[in-house]
């Protein structure tokens, strides 16, 4: 007998991909067996789907990279939708405002309706992950009270307190 050829070995690995790469269809670099490979991320690829790299596995087998989304400092993912929590000042919520909101495709202007409350969700159509249909970005308003840094700001809060009184919670 002589030496038997070793069987081809397909290799499987997980690949955490930045949301921006999934949104735009960017390339990412990975290290495989001491080499650096540049991989094109298909636009809108879903977690659990795989990218096959022919001949990059063990013994000339294929390498299958199972996609997962890397954690993002600002966004969460729900299916194809992107979730974002937007800090809003009390006067923006009460009076309405137009504010800049980050999305995976860059900042956009969002109109906050008057009399908005914390937890209200606003939809930016088509600003989620690509696909058929594309996802949306869901912006949840989080009303926060700014800290007081000087006498003018303290006086503004005191005027609000005097104007609203103690029974504003029941309104």
What are these model-predicted stretches?
Residues 35-36, 40-171:
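Intrinsically disordered, low-complexity linker/assembly segments
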Residues 10, 18-25, 31-50:
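Glycine/acidic-rich beta-strand-loop module
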Residues 1-29, 58-59, 64, 164-171:
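Post-J-domain flank of DnaJ/Hsp40 co-chaperones
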